[in-house]
């Protein structure tokens, strides 16, 4: 009997960059900024006035790992639904307000954890800041100043000609200064654009000129594939420089998919402890097994596993054994069979038809032992 240490860290490894120093605000129980972990959020796609459907979608988002959720509030019926939704939601609810300032006050009174305001389209917003600041301060409600390229203040469009990085940053800082005049600084800021290059530069300028926590987002990023690429590029560029305190991946998909992508981005940058990670080769003429099918079946079989486990699925003898040895669990396939590795040690060889079943069984065994040993221990698997 041999005990093989798994080598799985109990804490995240060093992140890609030192975090930008920023203020900390509380969005309900979730800290944002001030060195708090980067949080992942999304937005419901239901009519907020449909309380049951909205709470159901929030429950699905919560189960997927969402930490903060935003709900639209374009009508009085939506505003009337906010108290129940804010009270029954498992995670903090942010009301998203455009056009009508009265809904800002309704959201604050409803007990929402925060309110997003769009200074570019709320009627007479500058004149309402004093009242909004007082109401938010009285209720302890943070405000997100959400500047968006598609609804930029006309004064700035006239000045810059289009939604440039300078225009986005100036808009946000101007509105923040109005709140500051009324001694309100419980603020976070976003400056979103659908072009990742413009968006990245806008956030860089903003980060250099203020210490407010920043909400990262590429607006109208597009369908799943395109939106994922845009968000990964933009967030990676900023988070790798320590810029960003909470993220929302905008996709034209069910919102749960946004959370999956957001979590993967943070894990890839070591800003969150990694969960299950499948490493698989892209396949080539050397492959002696259907790598695509194998990787998909292993991924499906381990879906929902939360332990930090790296599983390598390799299709040939060139890189297969080396990659499998580097993983916590892996298979190197060839000649109709697969060598199963646990932390660099070959524990068994199985027929090709048994590879998926064996990998899933071994992963479950490792996960069970990790849970038994506790998150802070140094788990090991015993093989004979």
Swiss-Prot record:
It catalyses: (2E)-4-hydroxy-3-methylbut-2-enyl diphosphate + oxidized [flavodoxin] + H2O + 2 H(+) = 2-C-methyl-D-erythritol 2,4-cyclic diphosphate + reduced [flavodoxin]. It comes from the Bacteria. Disulfide bonds: none annotated. InterPro entries: Dihydropteroate_synth-like_sf (IPR011005), IspG_bac (IPR016425), IspG_bac-typ (IPR004588), NO2/SO3_Rdtase_4Fe4S_sf (IPR045854). SUPFAM superfamilies: Dihydropteroate synthetase-like, Nitrite and sulphite reductase 4Fe-4S domain-like. Its EC number is 1.17.7.3. This is 4-hydroxy-3-methylbut-2-en-1-yl diphosphate synthase (flavodoxin) 1. [4Fe-4S] cluster binds at residues 281, 284, 316, 323. GO terms for molecular function: 4 iron, 4 sulfur cluster binding; 4-hydroxy-3-methylbut-2-en-1-yl diphosphate synthase activity (ferredoxin); 4-hydroxy-3-methylbut-2-enyl-diphosphate synthase activity (flavodoxin); iron ion binding. Keywords: 4Fe-4S, Iron, Iron-sulfur, Isoprene biosynthesis, Metal-binding, Oxidoreductase. Binds 1 [4Fe-4S] cluster. Belongs to the IspG family. GO terms for biological process: isopentenyl diphosphate biosynthetic process, methylerythritol 4-phosphate pathway; terpenoid biosynthetic process. It holds the Pfam family GcpE. Pathway: Isoprenoid biosynthesis; isopentenyl diphosphate biosynthesis via DXP pathway; isopentenyl diphosphate from 1-deoxy-D-xylulose 5-phosphate: step 5/6. Converts 2C-methyl-D-erythritol 2,4-cyclodiphosphate (ME-2,4cPP) into 1-hydroxy-2-methyl-2-(E)-butenyl 4-diphosphate. Its cofactor is [4Fe-4S] cluster.
